């Protein structure tokens, strides 16, 4: 699987970079997690800082166009992203009970 970055847009207000990328693959469309790991390796980031939003493969093609958000830190990703998107990308969600317990200690 080969990842090519098509465009990068810096979003300093949300501490992230929006990336459009293209993947050339031999078999079926790769999973979201394998794409996330490959993209993170390509840009030298931790996989918890990368949130893949969209993967689009045209029928019969061996190319996938995708959209991802790369955050400065995993905490920034947890603060900004919606819970369902964090679950799709297997990024651990901090619960409110843990937060209140940590603040009380």
From Swiss-Prot:
Q: Which Pfam families match?
A: Ribosomal_S24e
Q: Which domain of life is it from?
A: Archaea
Keyword Ribonucleoprotein tagged: yes
GO MF terms listed in the record are: structural constituent of ribosome
Keywords, ordered alphabetically: Ribonucleoprotein, Ribosomal protein
**Family stated for the protein in its record:** Belongs to the eukaryotic ribosomal protein eS24 family.
Q: What is this protein called?
A: Small ribosomal subunit protein eS24
């Amino acid at each position: 699987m080969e990842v090519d970055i098509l465009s990068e847009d810096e979003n300093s207000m949300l501490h992230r970079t929006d990336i459009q990328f293209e993947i050339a693959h031999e078999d079926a469309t790769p999973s979201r997690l394998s794409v996330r790991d490959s993209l993170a390796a390509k840009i030298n980031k931790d996989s918890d800082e990368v949130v893949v939003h969209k993967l689009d493969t045209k029928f019969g093609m061996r190319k996938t166009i995708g959209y991802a958000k790369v955050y400065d830190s995993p905490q920034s990703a947890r603060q900004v992203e919606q819970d369902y998107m964090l679950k799709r990308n297997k990024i651990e969600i901090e619960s409110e009970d843990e937060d209140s317990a940590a603040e009380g200690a």
